[in-house]
Structures are given as structure tokens and as C-alpha cells.
């Protein structure tokens, strides 16, 4: 738990505690909303005292079992049991690997101010490997090191401790307690056969309901330490029984969907309902549902023939820009029983060759415009790959279809659990990861979204096809139009890149439904686009400031979609009705039908409501893993420890996907996004989430967008400093000094960046998300003047940002 050489003086303890701060837990999520990010939950302010208290009492059979457990563990003390429980509870709420508490032994003195204090540091990586009995014994040995105790006035009120644990033999008044926001008082009242645990807290900082929830967890954890001595600490349940039941109810998302239908079946049903309705608009090209279906059927026949000879679930590449041809190619591949791999024609040659080799493609569908470059990219290495020019194939098939038989879909025995497509997501090592997606999971998602977005009335919606072909929003936009008898309006690339022409294009074509990232939409003024009814955001968090900025440009319904390529088509949605301009939290909503989610600890244990953990996704839509990447699959796709007996009987919900997002369950049953785990920072033991700083910065008048990252200082990896980059509204002269001064008034000191650098544009990657690696390096020393804006290293303005997407 600690090294063999224990500190013996207050100075040594201070040095030891400060040395573990980078991996330390942070209890800020227990604070009231208005205090979060403004103070740290530490004993560093003499003016912060416990003003309220709540108690739990362990008595009767529970107390008897507790005392029996202590005797069975070689007579360890109640203090050691309480300390073990406290550290586990702090870890549950603080999301850290090390916790620091002050053990105040008040059993041998009448005055708490003269009580001896022992700092206790627990390393949970080691601690969770022990059995409960071993962990208590180890802490009991720690408490017996009398030469390591120090005086209260030498270590308390110096910001060293996450919480104080007072072991007392009598009732202790609040006025007697040391100054600290959180103090636990434990009293073993053997004469009355009970153990009393009091949680004393600063009433202005903590909600009573929050404290009550913590005490539920204390009771649960205390009982497990006493009642399960042979179990490992990692196996302890960190949520109370009542909370676990509530979490299970919130995951009751099971529902019916057309599980006997493939995606092409859903489109074919729309064709039968409305054969002559306009299906796809691209430039001057307007295709009805009947025409789209006939072309797709002809293409499917060709794919099955000697031209390519596709087999069931064979992968076929699509190397096309957004167009009506892409829609026909996708449907034709599905009708032939195959699956597609989207490849962007704008990709570098190496990226294209990687996808071809990784998937073993034997054929790639392209057009006349891109065919020459594609053949050049494939070269001799992939000379056996057939390049299919789709216009030529469609022309030949139309000419050959004299009896109309080629316009009828091929009769094949196709499965609903067949592969639908394989798409690539970016890899942290720079190597893309292929993710296979199946018909049934996408059918579940797209039919759920159709109902949620009220898209079921044919002929009433016009959906913009805005996203690049290689990203899932492209397919989402295509399907939500075509399975519901709506019109898909393909946005030409030259229009999509123009912040002036695009809004006019929306109005000209009567677009009602637009789906894009917030980074893109912030460039478009949609105020006078009367046709637009729905704005759907995907790929980025919608912050409070982002919502307000969108409301300046759009007054209709806004939906924030939460999605992962590796999991369901869309995992969750959060709706904002027309007129809603504010949001009080960072909720991403609730899971869609047949999707489950779990906020789990480092040991995959369910966490209490309000505690931060990592978000895992289960249920319908979780991919089986990454193509040809067994190492990453084992790391990110895990056996679901919370699959029910019903799940196992049906063969569902067997795996969970580790998202890498930090989150917490809200009392409403919604999940609040807390940032990426790989962007989480610990500075001097305080958890710093850049999104919180970014949100505060955009509250300042004139600041349009902000991103915050950590930069290494001269001292290397341990010497890290926050740097913010911000954009201003046109004409706003927001200086660095002004913005830093504003943040200093709104945030605790450690969360205020060393620098705030104004940029002309913030670089984005091909996904439309901020490209962190492309942000310019800066001198960490603050300049004396506000200075001008720094140019982005990769994009020179609005067009540059949009082109990347």
C-alpha cells in the first residue's frame, strides 16, 4: 500500500502525499453544481466547516456479523474496517487510483484538537488485488505504526486530504470537528450493540440527497468488507442494492423491431408504398423510388454475374463521391447479398491501398471520373482487383433489360444477421480500424430513430445528404429518408463548402432535416431557412454555449446524437424543443431501443448514481470487434458481466464496448458525458476536464469556440500546463488578458490555463472534429499584451474547415 519506509514527520507526509497527486481521486462530483470547478474537496480552507450531518447505524444481526468478522480477522480494529470502507467509497466517487484520508484517533483523548493524526494513502491498483480480510489487516497494521502519527495542527487544513475519518468513543458535536468539507465519525458503541457512522459535511457545498446516497454506498461496502472476507476487494459492489436495481430499470430498453427485415427490405417496402414518389435529388437528376429500385436491381444482377461474381457477405468497395450513384450502388450490393466498404476518393493512395489489403477486396465500384486514379493507386500490387465503372454497368444493364427481368430483384436466400458494411474508424496508433456492421442492428437503430424523429409520414420530409460517404451519418441520412418514403437531397460538394450558398440551397430544395457536426453548422446562418424543422448534431458534444450559439442561427428542434462506429448505429439521443436555449448539464440522454449502457469502475463494477466512471455500451449493435485486430478487440470489446439470463437464452447483449468516454448516471436516469478518458488530466491531484474550461470560456462575450489541451513544459511529462485556443465572433476584440482574468474569477486556480491563444480558425480532421495535434505550439510564458490572432496550422478559414469534413 505504501513503501516500507513510512514518513514520521508532517513535512515527510506532505512530500509523500504531494508525490501521489497525479493519480489521485477527486471528489468534486459530490459538490453542488454551482461549486463544481470552483473549489476542491480538500481540507484547505479553515472557513469551511461541517454544518450538517447524516447518520447510519449498523446494529442487530448486521452488527453481530461485523464483530464476528473482526474477531475472525485476528482481532483487527473497527477503525481499520471503517478506513478500508472509506477508501473504497472515495475511489468509487473520485475516479482515481490513489486516495488519501486522515485517520484521526480520538479514542485516547477528550479533545479532538489534541488527537493524533495518521495520513493513510491507498494505492487501489494494489489494494483491489487483496482479499477483503487482507486489506483490512494491512490497514490495521498501518494504524498500529504509532511513530508515524503526527499532530493535527501540523497536517490538517493544508489541502492534503480528500476526507477525514475520526474514530471516537463518544458522540462528537459538529463544533468539535476539524475544519474540513467532509468528515466521517465512526463510533463502535459495543455497550448498545451498534456501530454509528456519521457523515458531517458543509451544507453549503453538498446536497442532502447526495450525502444520503453516499451513506447508502458506505453501508453496502462496509457490509461486504465484513461479510465477504475471502473475496477480492475488486469484487466489492460499489453501488447500493437500491441503486443497482434502479440502474437495471433504466436499462430496460428491450423493444420490438422488424427483426425479420434487412435494410434493403425496408427500402423495398417504401418502393411498394410510393413507387412514383421522388426518392433522390442530385443536381438536375431526380429519381423516383421505382427508378432507384430498378437501377439497384439491375446492378445487383450484374454483381452476381460473371462481371464480379459476388458471394454472400463478400465485401465490395465503393469509391464514390456523394451522388445518386452511391445510393444505387449501396442498395445493389445489399440486394446481391454482399456488403460494402466505403473508401473516400480524396484519401491518400496509401490509405486506399491499406483498406483494399485489409479487407481483401476483389472489386471496387467507382465512376468514370475516379476510375483512372483508382487503377493508378491499385497498381501492380492489386492488379487482380476489378474496377467497376457503375455508369457503364447501369447503361449496359438498362440496354439489356428488354423484358424487364433485370429490374426485378434477384431471388436469394439472405439473412437478417448478414454483414451490411464495414467502415473504418481512426486509430490512436494511426492505423485505421475496420468495424463490421450487420443488418439487424442497423434496422433496430434506424427504425427507432424514424419513430423518435416522426419520420413515418411519407412525402413530408426532405433530408439533406450532407456527410461524406465514408462516415456513418451518410448512411443514417440515406436510410432515414428512403425507408420512410421521404426525399433524399444530395448536397453537391461545392455547395457544402460554401457558407453562403449552402443555406440558400436548403431553402431552394425545401430541406426539413439536416444532420452534421456542430463545428460545421456554426458557420451557417439558418435563421431564414423556413423549411428546416430538425437540426441533428453528431460527433461532438453540444455544450451549453454551443446550444445558445445554435439558437442564434436556428429556432427549430435540435437533437444531439451520441454514436460510436463500434456500437449501435446511434446509441442515445437528447432532444431540445424549439425555444429551449439553456441546458443545466451535459446529458446525452437515454439509450435507444435495445441498447444498454453501463457506467463502470476500473474493475467493471457498477458505480453509484453521480459517480464518474467509464461508459460501456451493450445490447443490440455492438460490433464483434475490429477486423484483423485481435489485440485491440480484446482491449475494447469485453464479455458483458451484466447480461441477464434472458439475454443469454436469446444470445443477445453478450459483449460490451469500452467507449473511452467518462460519464455518470444522473438521478433522472440519463447519462451525463464528462469528457474523454484520454483527455482527462490530473494536475496537483485535481481532476481537470478540458470541456469544463472550454464551456466557461465560451461564456465570455465575444468568444465563439474554445478548445483546451495540456502542453508539456520544460520539465517534461510531469511538467504539464493547460493551453486554451479560442475563436471570437466577427469584430470582437477579446484579448488573452481579458479572457484569463474572466476565467480566474470563474474557476479554481489550477484549472485556469497558462495561455489563451486566439486563432483565426481551429483545425479539424476528416471527421469534422478538432484536430488536437494540429494546434500550434506556444510559449507557455504569458505575454504582456493581448496580441493578435494566431493562424491555424492546417486550415486558413471557414472553407478550410469545411473541406476537411
UniProtKB/Swiss-Prot annotation:
Note accompanying the cofactor annotation: Binds 3 phosphopantetheines covalently.
GO CC annotation: cytoplasm
Record's keyword terms, sorted: Antibiotic biosynthesis, ATP-binding, Ligase, Multifunctional enzyme, Nucleotide-binding, Phosphopantetheine, Repeat
Record-linked InterPro entries: AA_adenyl_dom, AMP-bd_C_sf, AMP-binding_CS, AMP-dep_synth/lig_dom, ANL_N_sf
Family annotation (Gene3D superfamilies): 3.30.300.30, N-terminal domain of ligase-like, Nonribosomal peptide synthetase, condensation domain
Cofactor: pantetheine 4'-phosphate
GO MF entries: ATP binding; N-(5-amino-5-carboxypentanoyl)-L-cysteinyl-D-valine synthase activity; phosphopantetheine binding
Pathways per UniProt: Antibiotic biosynthesis; penicillin G biosynthesis; penicillin G from L-alpha-aminoadipate and L-cysteine and L-valine: step 1/3
Entry-linked Pfam families: AMP-binding (PF00501)
EC nos: 6.3.2.26
Annotated catalysed reactions: L-2-aminoadipate + L-valine + L-cysteine + 3 ATP + H2O = N-[(5S)-5-amino-5-carboxypentanoyl]-L-cysteinyl-D-valine + 3 AMP + 3 diphosphate + 3 H(+)
Region (Disordered): 783-805
Biological process annotations from GO: amino acid activation for nonribosomal peptide biosynthetic process; antibiotic biosynthetic process; secondary metabolite biosynthetic process
Biological role: Each of the constituent amino acids of ACV are activated as aminoacyl-adenylates with peptide bonds formed through the participation of amino acid thioester intermediates.
PANTHER family found in the cross-reference section: FATTY ACID SYNTHASE, NONRIBOSOMAL PEPTIDE SYNTHETASE
Similarity comment: family membership: Belongs to the ATP-dependent AMP-binding enzyme family.
Protein name: N-(5-amino-5-carboxypentanoyl)-L-cysteinyl-D-valine synthase
Species per Swiss-Prot/TrEMBL record: Streptomyces clavuligerus
